[in-house]
């Protein structure tokens, strides 16, 4: 399809620092082309100290909506006119949309992306989340919305664990040393830590849990790693070898993007498979995306 940009082309985008290796432009522009929409999705590198002026600038030039990635997901909250309740609970926004009356609204489609591969799971299954950072917050909210539980979170930062329990009192928090005693009943294991991520000089061949720990999971457990480079991660390779069901983090990225794009386009059906193919092609080319 001819993708000429004209005076009528509408702008969407991504702000973060860095954004050069993001898969989002490839995914969104492929979907927009397939849908015949006169939109263009552009990555905008925005340093932390320039966030407020950048957000004002996007409004001034008529951008219809944009995604938000590291390091702005929390910092953008006070710059928005309204924030949806689930995003406020998580304390982070990753999708921003123009309001009819002016200003910006914010939501968190990371939650939607997280839950999409889990929709077939039965409710009430014991769930263990590894990590206590921003990704863990989206995972907790998603698990609770799906009716999974009990939901437990294991982390290394007592301060972050306390903050999680203040937001979600029904969630049990564990020190890293305590997690082994819960593995035998864990039907869904979620890694939200960066361990296993392929980056220069890195933790690429590491896993947040050992082979011996993964063997403690019940037969047929689901293991979900939000890391997607490499694919599969060491954690997912071991999980598959042990007969568990592996889910890679690329699905979360694709589905959060699809949800955001549908929101910007007024609820239109988005070609998820087109986005998946574009993401995989881009991933094969760059190898080490940042978002």
Swiss-Prot record:
CDD domains, alphabetized: NAD_bind_Shikimate_DH
Enzyme Commission no: 1.1.1.25
Keyword terms of this UniProt record: Amino-acid biosynthesis, Aromatic amino acid biosynthesis, NADP, Oxidoreductase
A Pfam family it matches: Shikimate_dh_N
Pathway(s) served: Metabolic intermediate biosynthesis; chorismate biosynthesis; chorismate from D-erythrose 4-phosphate and phosphoenolpyruvate: step 4/7
Domain of life: Bacteria
GO MF, any single term: shikimate 3-dehydrogenase (NADP+) activity
Disulfide bonds: none
Entry similarity comment: Belongs to the shikimate dehydrogenase family.
Protein name: Shikimate dehydrogenase (NADP(+))
Organism: Synechococcus sp. (strain JA-3-3Ab)
């Amino acid at each position: 399809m001819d993708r000429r940009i004209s005076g009528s082309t509408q702008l969407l985008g991504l702000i973060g620092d860095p954004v050069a290796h993001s898969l989002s432009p490839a995914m969104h522009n492929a979907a927009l082309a397939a849908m015949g929409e006169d939109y263009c999705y552009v990555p905008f590198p925005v340093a932390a100290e320039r966030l407020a002026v950048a957000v004002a600038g996007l409004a001034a030039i008529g951008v219809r909506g944009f995604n938000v990635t590291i390091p702005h997901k929390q910092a953008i909250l006070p710059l928005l006119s309204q924030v949806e309740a689930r995003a406020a609970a998580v304390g982070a926004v990753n999708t921003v949309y123009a309001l009819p009356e002016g200003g910006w609204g914010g939501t968190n489609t990371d939650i939607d992306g997280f839950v999409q591969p889990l929709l077939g799971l039965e409710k009430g299954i014991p769930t263990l989340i590894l990590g206590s950072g921003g990704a863990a917050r989206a995972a907790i909210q998603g698990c609770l919305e799906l009716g999974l539980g009990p939901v437990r979170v294991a982390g290394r930062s007592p301060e972050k664990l306390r903050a999680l329990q203040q937001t979600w009192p029904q969630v049990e928090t564990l020190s890293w040393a305590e997690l082994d005693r819960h593995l035998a009943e864990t039907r869904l294991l979620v890694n939200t830590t960066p361990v296993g991520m392929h980056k220069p000089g890195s933790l690429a061949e590491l896993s947040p849990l050992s082979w011996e720990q993964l063997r403690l999971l019940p037969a047929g457990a689901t293991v979900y790693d939000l890391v997607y480079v490499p694919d599969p991660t060491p954690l997912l390779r071991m999980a598959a070898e042990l007969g568990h069901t592996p889910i890679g983090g690329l699905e979360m990225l694709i589905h959060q993007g699809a949800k955001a794009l549908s929101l910007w386009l007024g609820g239109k059906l988005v070609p998820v498979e087109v986005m998946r193919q574009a993401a995989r092609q881009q991933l094969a080319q760059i190898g080490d995306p940042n978002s």
